[in-house]
């Protein structure tokens, strides 16, 4: 068994690997070279809000539309994310300035919003919706300049520039609602080095926007769709009254700036984290947890187990040794098959399926092969990998089921292929019905749902059956001791051996090893933030695997010392105890970080959180179970049994 020092070289290797790969970026698309005055298309992605968790497509609001609306063909991940990428009427030319242009205005007439349209726009503004646009596949960002005091005299301040994804649809002030009806686009380009006789080409490397609200009376528009912006602050914002019709102009301006940023580094603006030190603190905290558990394991194995096994193997004092060491007393029952072996093996098979999928996704993303420029690639890859990993889940479930004296392999394979995926599909279908009712773009379209079902029954199910068949035919795990025909009576257990107490005790340390990273993951999921520190995430995942394995071994050792041989289900449940703390943290995050008050957004949050907790429990429970199973087989194989 590995000690704390055994993990040191591996930790150093992973640290170096993470440092080398955290900034590594493999583009998902080829660069586009623009010439002077080439059109740069501005597309809309969706509207999002952390208060409602319901995305909407861009033209669900009365924005100006082009003569022909064209939606981009999307992959599975984009559809599941609620993206609906569509063209817009913004006319942007490479390196060509525009001071002010009016959208969808005919003969110098403003746009009139009906009462229903005004009510809808006002509702979206009060719900704090953001608009997401892209130019050359780069998402638009709003620059935020934050000032922090460096000295106690408050004279020196440091400017911290951060970027907010998308731009706010509008704002409220003293019970009045205002719409951002003017967009100042700032696009940065990098001039490519060319031969002397060749024309210069440009590449877009950043896309910013400054949203403004300008009242109709303060904008001067002419018949050529040009307009004049008010100077300085001599203007009032455009109010939206939800109880009546509103007239306004939709306008925009374009400004170009040359940048030293190269095309390969253009995503750094969105992916660079200002709180990397917090991630390092998380890693150090996690390593300390692993070393602490390694120390406990070393003490158990070196001092206790080695001494117990040596004493037990002495032929002249077997009876006395058995009386003083509880874990050896249950050698005839420790491998007795548990209740419901089919369900246990099915859940563990799904856990193996999840483990393989997550490990590959994080590793591939860490290498930069799932770049954010390939929209939806991460989710698409995860879905397909989970289906194809069914062969490994089926194989492990089939072999374990046979080890537990199971005989109905076809039923077991069906249970493995449908139990966990069926629960996930059922919850998602119910939540999707509510999303459909809100006419959100986050609702999975019916054809996509049919396609997912076809992939489930056409790919995942056959692969699970195939793996289960070969796993069931393979030689079962060789248990080192025989099982007695008559079960041994289990003595009364102390209060701290209670299953729920065990879950609380076993879950706290693995959760402590990853809770800081969990905060950033929650921010990415629920607050529409980018997360691309997969180097950190990969290292945290490895530490989570090690800590779950270690705590599982410790818990099963103390259970066997208490002469309780019913460790199969208990260890699976206890090893997934960190999922309980994930649930507690999710509730804390909902109460303290999110401003969700309506029923359907709350239902969506806790519905998806339930899926996350269930999946995390399967993952950590499976890791801990197999670590404990290997440990139990190892220690009983070292004991001589007559």
From Swiss-Prot:
The modification Phosphotyrosine is found at residue 312. Keywords: Endosome, Golgi apparatus, Membrane, Phosphoprotein, Signal, Transmembrane, Transmembrane helix. GO terms for cellular component: early endosome; Golgi apparatus; membrane. One of its GO terms (biological process) is phagocytosis. Residues 303-346, 398-416, 471-501, 557-570, 620-642 are cytoplasmic. Residues 24-281, 368-376, 438-449, 523-535, 592-598 are extracellular. Highly expressed in metastatic melanoma cells whereas it is undetectable in primary melanoma cells, healthy skin tissues and peripheral blood lymphocytes. Expressed in CD34(+) hematopoietic progenitor cells and during monocyte and granulocyte differentiation. Overexpressed in acute myeloid leukemia, in particular in those displaying granulocytic differentiation (at protein level). Pfam families: EMP70. It is a multi-pass membrane protein. The chain crosses the membrane at residues 282-302, 347-367, 377-397, 417-437, 450-470, 502-522, 536-556, 571-591, 599-619. Residues 1-23 form the signal peptide. Interacts with ATP6V1H in colon cancer cells. Associates with proteins harboring glycine-rich transmembrane domains and ensures their efficient localization to the cell surface. Regulates the assembly and activity of V-ATPase in colon cancer cells via its interaction with V-type proton ATPase subunit H (ATP6V1H) and contributes to V-ATPase-mediated pH alterations in cancer cells which play an important role in drug resistance and invasiveness of colon cancer cells. PANTHER family: TRANSMEMBRANE 9 SUPERFAMILY MEMBER 4, TRANSMEMBRANE 9 SUPERFAMILY PROTEIN. Induction: Transcriptionally repressed following hypoxia by HIF1A in leukemic cells. This is Transmembrane 9 superfamily member 4. The gene is TM9SF4. Belongs to the nonaspanin (TM9SF) (TC 9.A.2) family. It is found in: Membrane; Golgi apparatus; Early endosome.
């Amino acid at each position: 068994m590995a000690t704390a020092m055994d993990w040191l070289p591996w930790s150093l290797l992973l640290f170096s690997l993470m440092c080398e790969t955290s900034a590594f970026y493999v583009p998902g698309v080829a660069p586009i070279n623009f010439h002077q005055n080439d059109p740069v298309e501005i597309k809309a992605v969706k509207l999002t809000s952390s208060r409602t968790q319901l995305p909407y497509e861009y033209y669900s609001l009365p924005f100006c539309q082009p003569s022909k609306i064209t939606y981009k063909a999307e992959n599975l991940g984009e559809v599941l994310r609620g993206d609906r990428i569509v063209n817009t009427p913004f006319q942007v030319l490479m390196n060509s300035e525009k001071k002010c242009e009016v959208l969808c205005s005919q003969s110098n007439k403003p746009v009139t919003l009906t009462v229903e349209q005004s009510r809808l726009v006002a509702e979206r503004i009060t719900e704090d919706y953001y608009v997401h646009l892209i130019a050359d596949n780069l998402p638009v960002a709003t620059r935020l300049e934050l000032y922090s005091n460096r000295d106690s005299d408050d004279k020196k301040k440091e400017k911290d520039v951060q970027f907010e994804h998308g731009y706010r649809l509008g704002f409220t002030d003293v019970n009045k609602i205002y719409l951002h009806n003017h967009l100042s686009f700032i696009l940065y380009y990098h001039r490519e080095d060319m031969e002397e006789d060749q024309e210069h080409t440009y590449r877009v490397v950043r896309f910013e926007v400054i949203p403004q609200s300008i009242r109709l009376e303060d904008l001067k528009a002419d018949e050529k769709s040009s307009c004049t912006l008010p100077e300085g602050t001599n203007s009032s914002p455009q109010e939206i009254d939800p109880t009546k019709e509103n007239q306004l102009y939709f306008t925009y301006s374009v400004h170009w700036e040359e940048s030293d940023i190269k095309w390969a580094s253009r995503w750094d603006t969105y992916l660079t984290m200002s709180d990397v030190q917090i991630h390092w603190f998380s890693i150090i905290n996690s390593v300390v947890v692993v070393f602490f558990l390694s120390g406990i394991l070393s003490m158990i194995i070196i001092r206790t187990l080695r001494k117990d096994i040596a004493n037990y193997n002495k032929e002249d004092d077997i009876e006395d040794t058995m009386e003083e060491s509880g874990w050896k007393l249950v050698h005839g029952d420790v491998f007795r098959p548990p209740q419901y072996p089919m369900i246990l093996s099915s859940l563990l098979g799904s856990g193996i399926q999840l483990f393989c999928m997550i490990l590959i996704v994080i590793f591939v993303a860490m290498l930069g092969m799932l770049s954010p420029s390939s929209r939806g690639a991460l989710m698409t890859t995860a879905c397909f990998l989970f289906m194809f990993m069914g062969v490994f889940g089926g194989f492990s479930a089939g072999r374990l089921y046979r080890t537990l004296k199971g005989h109905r392999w076809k039923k077991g394979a069906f249970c493995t292929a449908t139990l966990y995926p069926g629960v996930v599909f059922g919850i998602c279908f119910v939540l999707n019905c509510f999303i459909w009712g809100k006419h959100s773009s986050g609702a999975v379209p019916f054809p996509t749902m049919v396609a997912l079902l076809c992939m489930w029954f056409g790919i995942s199910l056959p692969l699970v059956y195939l793996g289960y068949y070969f796993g069931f035919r393979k030689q079962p795990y060789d248990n080192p001791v025989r099982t007695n025909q008559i079960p041994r009576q289990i003595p009364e257990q102390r209060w701290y051996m209670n299953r729920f107490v065990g879950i609380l005790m076993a879950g706290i340390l693995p959760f402590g090893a990853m809770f800081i990273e969990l905060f950033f993951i929650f921010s990415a999921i629920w607050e529409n933030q980018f997360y691309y520190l997969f180097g950190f995430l990969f290292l945290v995942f490895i530490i989570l695997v090690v800590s779950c394995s270690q705590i599982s071994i410790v818990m099963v050792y103390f259970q066997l010392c208490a002469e309780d041989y019913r460790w199969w289900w208990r260890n699976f449940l206890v090893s997934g105890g960190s999922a309980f703390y994930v649930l507690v943290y999710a509730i804390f995050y909902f109460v303290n970080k999110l401003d969700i008050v309506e029923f359907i957004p709350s239902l969506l949050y806790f519905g998806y959180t339930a899926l996350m907790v269930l999946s995390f429990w399967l993952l950590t429970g499976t890791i801990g179970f197999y670590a404990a199973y290997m440990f139990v087989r190892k220690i009983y194989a070292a004991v001589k049994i007559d």
